[in-house]
């Protein structure tokens, strides 16, 4: 697929944000993943559903499960991703289930994209594309 380079190239460093205090790993905001999918010319669909559990005796949204399907004229793949809610948000009235679901869905979306290879450098720590890594290995 000619769009693989456009789709799967590492995100430019200026889009990468530092992890908030107490969090692991730098990140790229959700909107940039959507822009990358849109601009690469692939078609995709996204489905997300909340995950419920009981917290302090109340039924609460504690996470999200998302499924992304990516096409390039042919079916390329379907990938799942999960996002969770920080426990402190469940105890804080400032954070409701709606805002918590939004955050969990964003994480689920980015994790599902990562399974395909989009943004994987943020998880692996590598900023080289496959082509660059192969060329470097050949010397």
Spell out what each predicted region is.
Residues 2-3, 18, 130-139:
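Interfaces that engage single-stranded nucleic acids at replication/repair/recombination sites
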Residues 31-137:
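Positively charged, aromatic-enriched nucleic acid-contacting surfaces
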